[in-house]
From Swiss-Prot:
Expression across tissues: Restricted to the posterior 16 midbody segments. Expressed in the dorsoventral muscles, which arise from the septal mesoderm and lie in the groove of the intercaecal constrictions.
Organism: Helobdella robusta (Californian leech)
SMART domains: HOX (SM00389)
GO biological process: anterior/posterior pattern specification; regulation of transcription by RNA polymerase II
Keyword terms, alphabetized: Developmental protein, DNA-binding, Homeobox, Nucleus
GO cellular component: nucleus
Region (Disordered), start-end ranges: 1-32, 117-221
Database matches in Pfam families: Homeodomain
Biased composition (Basic and acidic residues): 124-143
Role noted for this protein: Sequence-specific transcription factor which is part of a developmental regulatory system that provides cells with specific positional identities on the anterior-posterior axis. May play a role in midgut regionalization.
Name of the protein in its database record: Homeobox protein LOX2
DNA-binding region: 217-276
Primary location class: nucleus
Assigned protein family: Belongs to the Antp homeobox family.
Length: 429
């Protein structure tokens, strides 16, 4: 069938060239195939239609220069060879091809080879070709079609690779020149770039980021100058909370907004609160570390009526000496059996050191080493404090004059057999 069609086309082409020398007036009228205003549908093309079309084509070529008349046969072959039917329905049968080609006969453009000129490109004719003509077309011819119209058409058809087109059996893609919306193979969503790549993605309203300030960059922290900081600190010393009127005045003075001043004062109050809290925590820690030594409050004050007293005679005596003169230490209350044991003692350590004899008389300086030796090993606290029970010979060895024979308490505390007062010189009052 294909061979027969080729032979028929060649015979018709010869007829057209022979009749091109004497154009007839019957073909000077507009052919119904070119009538784009009417809505009549052209039926399937017959053999006579093809012959009349080629005759009409030759008559149109006769209107141009003599160069076109000499090469009329060549132009006729090119025009038939390079025109594609854009509305084929993927069938190789000639009957289906004729039926489908009539649907998109109107509103089409001429696609010719590079050998033609611009004046010939402006002419229009229906797209009528056959499968054999399309298969003979090479890749270079397809690229030249796009260049003939100023590069408006890409080499690939609707973004589909040429390899994919060649692998499809029994199908032929539509020409890029055909833009009729009634075409069956036309896809409005097909990309215009080769390889199926989009030139630019479409933008829709739902693709925008939600939010009034979505396009704005987040504002950074406000940097205050030294002058602004000093003025704000000065104002904070007088008023920790600003009124609206004063805040407006500061905003005009310091070239800041009211919101910036308000935030600065909030941060400053929070900073002050943290500083006060830190000072309180330090004071609590110091209170827990302080014991009897260096304390303003004597730990013996809480033990006035405690059962630790040997004779239960109160807090005057050794505890007063320990709290005042020594300033702490082991504050267990010890005293003699008689009240006279406390007469020579006082809460002031200095007075005790001056009046150790209990009678107001002077006393010699006690040797420090001998004092420690005499009171280091004491059988009991009571014997240490009560001079009546002590051995007078041992006391005299320490060069201490006991005028009235009263207790020999010299301002030291013997706790658990060890002296707690060291390095003290006892001079006369």
């Amino acid at each position: 069938n294909n061979n027969n069609n080729i032979n028929n086309n060649n015979s018709r082409l010869n007829i057209a060239t022979s009749s091109s020398a004497t154009p007839s007036t019957t073909f000077q009228q507009k052919s119904p195939y070119y009538d784009t205003t009417t809505s009549t549908t052209v039926t399937s093309l017959t053999s006579t239609d093809y012959s009349s079309y080629q005759q009409q084509q030759q008559l149109l070529l006769a209107e141009f220069d003599t160069d076109y008349k000499e090469n009329a046969e060549q132009f006729a072959d090119v025009s038939v060879q390079n025109v594609n039917i854009s509305c084929s329905n993927s069938n190789n049968n000639n009957t289906d091809l004729n039926n489908n080609s009539s649907k998109c006969m109107n509103n089409s453009n001429i696609i010719i080879d590079n050998n033609s000129t611009d004046s010939f490109q402006q002419k229009q004719h229906p797209e009528t070709t056959e499968d054999t003509k399309y298969n003979a077309e090479t890749e270079e011819d397809r690229k030249s079609h796009g260049k003939a119209f100023g590069g408006h058409f890409a080499s690939s058809r609707y973004g589909i690779d040429d390899d994919v087109i060649s692998n499809r059996t029994g199908s032929r893609p539509s020409s890029p020149a055909s833009t009729t919306p009634s075409c069956e193979n036309f896809s409005p969503h097909s990309p215009s770039m080769k390889g199926g790549k989009m030139g630019s993605a479409p933008s829709y309203p739902w693709m925008s980021i939600v939010g009034p300030n979505s396009n704005q960059r987040r504002r950074g922290r406000q940097t205050y100058t030294r002058y602004q900081t000093l003025e704000l600190e000065k104002e904070f010393k007088f008023n920790r909370y600003l009124t609206r009127r004063r805040r407006i005045e500061l905003s005009h003075t310091l070239y800041l907004t009211e919101r910036q001043i308000k935030i600065w004062f909030q941060n400053r109050r929070m900073k002050e609160k943290k500083e006060v809290q830190a000072i309180r925590e330090l004071n609590e820690i110091e209170k827990t570390k302080i014991g009897c030594f260096g304390s303003l409050r004597s730990p013996c004050d809480d033990d006035d009526d405690d059962d630790d007293d040997i004779d239960g005679s109160g807090s005057s005596g050794v505890c007063g000496v320990a709290s005042g003169g020594i300033g702490g230490g082991d504050c267990r209350k010890v005293s003699g059996n008689s009240g006279s044991s406390r007469n020579g003692l006082s809460s002031n350590g200095g007075n005790v050191m001056g009046g150790i004899n209990g009678a107001g008389g002077g006393a010699n300086v006690v040797n420090h080493d001998e004092l420690i030796t005499s009171c280091r090993d004491v059988p009991s606290q009571q014997n240490c404090l009560n001079g009546n029970n002590n051995n007078n010979n041992n006391i005299n060895n320490n060069n201490i004059n006991n005028n009235n024979g009263v207790e020999m308490m010299v301002g030291m505390v013997c706790s658990s057999g060890r002296m707690m007062m060291e390095g003290v010189d006892y001079g006369g009052g």
